[in-house]
């Protein structure tokens, strides 16, 4: 796998979609909205809850808290031991639900095995569910009336919009059917007028599906699962994956070296979707605060 930073030009002509640069512009807009709220006496607040000591989760949480502080949001990080009981976590979430200084609550996944992610997510007040995972928010998204859009799919849509990618009538293929990325991604693309195919681990002849895609979104957690032979010439390729390769370097679910020879545009790893996910978390938190401010 070849690491490709957003600042490095693609030698074969595939346009690099610079998620880091777009995320910076979004964070600057968030900072302006935070200042406008301050004039009303409101400071957007985000609580990030981490259970256990998973190294990757610690990095994600640290990045989210740092982004909040840089944009002027109030943020608190609560870290608990892996042996915390589910009841204790639910009680803490209930307290945060009732805290008027907190507009958004994020529980970092995955949780320890003895906890039900579904039960924990459902405990978060829907109006503070800035991840967009609560069943109420999933239903609103399904009907085209989202309160919060899940951060990663929301970020992908902003990238496609910024790149001027035509979605109406386009063939969009999503590899990965998770509740966090794949399913909400399908809903957002469908609402934009694309024709959707969702592939999962049971899909027969995956390459035949991906080669039809004008827009290909890959979110499997499997390094290099998609290579250039599986991509339609000129397609827009969005790599949601972030993995550690055998060499210890970050890599995506798409083999960048071969994909860039075929794609018309492609997101790098790192510097692509990751920064956008955090940027859209800030957007959702500010929107939650704006609703309370009236």
Curated annotation (Swiss-Prot):
What reaction does this catalyse? (6R)-5,10-methylene-5,6,7,8-tetrahydrofolate + NADP(+) = (6R)-5,10-methenyltetrahydrofolate + NADPH; (6R)-5,10-methenyltetrahydrofolate + H2O = (6R)-10-formyltetrahydrofolate + H(+)
Spell out the disulfide connections. none
**Gene Ontology molecular functions:** methenyltetrahydrofolate cyclohydrolase activity; methylenetetrahydrofolate dehydrogenase (NADP+) activity
InterPro entries to which the protein is assigned, alphabetical: Aminoacid_DH-like_N_sf (IPR046346), NAD(P)-bd_dom_sf (IPR036291), THF_DH/CycHdrlase (IPR000672), THF_DH/CycHdrlase_cat_dom (IPR020630), THF_DH/CycHdrlase_CS (IPR020867), THF_DH/CycHdrlase_NAD-bd_dom (IPR020631)
Under Pfam families, the record lists: THF_DHG_CYH, THF_DHG_CYH_C
Q: Does the keyword Amino-acid biosynthesis apply?
A: yes
UniProt keyword annotations, A-Z: Amino-acid biosynthesis, Histidine biosynthesis, Hydrolase, Methionine biosynthesis, Multifunctional enzyme, NADP, One-carbon metabolism, Oxidoreductase, Purine biosynthesis
Residues given in the record as NADP(+) binding sites: 176-178, 201, 242
Coiled-coil spans are none
Part of which pathway? Answer: One-carbon metabolism; tetrahydrofolate interconversion
- PROSITE patterns (UniProt xref): THF_DHG_CYH_1, THF_DHG_CYH_2
- Asked whether the keyword Hydrolase is assigned, the reply is yes
For this record, an example GO cellular component is: cytosol
According to its UniProt entry, the protein's GO biological process terms are: L-histidine biosynthetic process; methionine biosynthetic process; purine nucleotide biosynthetic process; tetrahydrofolate interconversion
EC number(s) on file: 1.5.1.5, 3.5.4.9
Query: What role does it play?
Result: Catalyzes the oxidation of 5,10-methylenetetrahydrofolate to 5,10-methenyltetrahydrofolate and then the hydrolysis of 5,10-methenyltetrahydrofolate to 10-formyltetrahydrofolate.
Summarize the subunit comment: Homodimer.
Q: Describe the family membership recorded for this protein in Swiss-Prot or TrEMBL.
A: Belongs to the tetrahydrofolate dehydrogenase/cyclohydrolase family.
State what protein this is by name.
Answer: Bifunctional protein FolD
* Species in which this protein is naturally found: Bordetella petrii (strain ATCC BAA-461 / DSM 12804 / CCUG 43448)
Q: What is the lineage of its organism?
A: Bacteria, Pseudomonadati, Pseudomonadota, Betaproteobacteria, Burkholderiales
Gene name per UniProt: folD
